[in-house]
């Protein structure tokens, strides 16, 4: 992901607490919410990208919705002409560009750094499990985000 896109996401999603799925989607004025299975491919209809959100939010469904939004950001201009049956949710989840964008959506850099700093001990280490709980994401995603931010150190003993 390029720095310009990261900055845009950071500015639009800036917050000191993790946003819920509805709040995240509402930050994108050309997206509308559908209720259903979060492992769904987003589609374009009537001038809007349709993102599917489950009734109950979990860390895993937050990741799934972030991947849908990432797919729209990465490939949105092509969605209107595509046959949606050619793309599966697995394709989206395996796309490296979508992965980077999804991490930035779930954990904007400033929120990530502030949360990590709040949890850090005197040596600058923090528990990845607690970080994941605070950010409402699976542990593996919290650790993956740290790889893109040079000033973050994670104590991985518990992973």
Residue ranges: model-predicted function:
Residues 1-159:
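Active-site hotspot residues in diverse enzymes, especially metal/ion-binding acidic/histidine motifs
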């Amino acid at each position: 992901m390029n720095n310009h896109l990261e900055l845009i996401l950071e500015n639009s999603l800036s917050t000191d607490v993790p946003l819920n799925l509805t709040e995240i989607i509402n930050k994108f004025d050309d997206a509308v919410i559908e209720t259903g299975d979060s492992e769904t491919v987003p589609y374009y209809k009537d001038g809007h990208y349709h993102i599917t959100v489950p009734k109950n939010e979990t860390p895993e469904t937050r990741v799934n919705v972030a991947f849908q939004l990432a797919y729209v950001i990465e490939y949105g201009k092509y969605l209107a002409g595509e046959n949606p049956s050619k793309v599966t949710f697995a394709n989206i989840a395996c796309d490296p560009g979508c992965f980077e964008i999804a991490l930035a959506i779930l954990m904007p850099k400033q929120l990530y750094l502030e949360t990590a700093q709040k949890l850090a001990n005197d040596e600058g280490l923090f528990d990845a499990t607690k970080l994941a709980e605070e950010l409402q994401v699976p542990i593996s995603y919290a650790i993956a985000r740290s790889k893109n931010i040079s000033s973050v150190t994670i104590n991985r003993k518990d992973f």
